[in-house]
Amino acid sequence: NSIKNPDIFIKTNIYGTWNLLNSAYKTWFLEPFLKKDEFKQSFFYQISTDEVYGSLGENGKFTEDNAYAPNSPYSASKASADMLVRSYHHTYGLNAVISNCSNNYGPFQHDEKLIPTIIRNALNNAQIPIYGDGKNIRDWLYVKDHCVAIESIYKYAFEKIKENNSFFDVFNIGTNEEWQNIDIANKICSYLDNVLPKNTSYKEQITFVKDRAGHDRRYAIDPTKLQRVIGWKAQENFNSGLDKTIQWYIKKYKG
């Protein structure tokens, strides 16, 4: 969507984030670096994405020290928003934390996303579109694990601000669960072959389509800092999380 219609992403992620930051500053502060007493422990939590780092080669993982190198209008808008958050901390003293997560999956995800699309099209006996050669790699994070990570980071930031009035930090949230898109499609089809068998395998519906513009080859998050500093660890591996996800979408799409 950001490739066909980037306007809404620019307005929401850049201008929208600036509106929130500016409102927070005007509400919380008397002047730069001087907070109102009732907002001493307030801070801004920016939830971002691993896409801001750009595309990786075959080796290595994104750490919090990686430079931003976004390659699509969406990732550029998120990178711009992150930079605005950073600027409000350094310019005005607004406490802030940024978390950059890997690909989320699980119940209630938007229908256009990869995993819901594979399941929905498989169940509807439609083509299952896979961009390019299907070998684009993503690090996958179950949505509930992401929620727990966000809560843990929030609590950590709140306690740190009690100790020190100035606070800014960045955390990557990932699971070291790297999967090619084609492998995900095959896993889902195999699952459906077992629980909802039909005359032919669902894998026969997989269709390779023209790659989309700006399609980064590989993302991979290094969550070491989050694990070391806060003690967070994902509770779902990709297999267990995907099983729960498929079961949820079968109920949604089949009733």
What function would you assign to each model-found segment?
Residues 1-104, 124, 147, 153, ...:
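N-terminal Rossmann-like NAD(P)+-binding domain of SDR-like oxidoreductases, especially those catalyzing
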Residues 46, 106-107, 205-207:
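Intrinsically disordered, low-complexity segments enriched in polar/charged residues with Gly/Pro
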Residues 63-64, 115-117:
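Short, hinge-like loop/turn segments at secondary-structure boundaries
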Residues 116, 122-255:
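C-terminal substrate-binding subdomain of Rossmann-fold SDR/epimerase-dehydratase oxidoreductases
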